[in-house]
Amino acid sequence: MSDPQSPRAPRWALWLPLGLFLAFVVLVTLGLLKPASHDIPSRMIGQPLPAFDLPAASDARPGLATRDFATGKPRLLNIFASWCIPCAVESPVLAQLARQGVEIDGIAIRDHKPDLAQFLARNGNPYARIGADNVSAVQLAIGSSGVPESFVIDGKGTIRYQHIGDIRPEQVPMILAKLQEAGQ
């Protein structure tokens, strides 16, 4: 009587599932370790500002409208709020830009006049105009997804650049370059 031997699977066939599983685990781990970008760039870059006319958010400055950007000079539009910690951190940098001749307009998001007045008194007021966007309608229309965000607007009212997050001191030269590009 012969002992029928069952056919053996090749040795690699035993290790293949384990190898594939380990490769999967490594790829998933690397994907989880990579920081996710939560930045949502505006689709409005290269487009004219949407029409808006915001009331004054502060007694110290006039409101803000689309027509204010058709001056022939590039401007920085800063989306901020008194309740935003990074906005307070950004304030000295905006003041530095204003001292260097940059015209800065602000849109205060979901803010209250007394809170905003206190914020500006504490952190300085680099803004030529501040519009009150109490329901974030203009913020969303220009493609902003959070605060702070800044946009370089050319002298015709076209959005040329979006900066997501607070502007840091080391980014000032880049912002100045973007403003200069927008003025050409």
Label every PLM stretch briefly:
Residues P10-L14, A88-V89, S144:
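Hydrophobic alpha-helical transmembrane segments of integral membrane proteins
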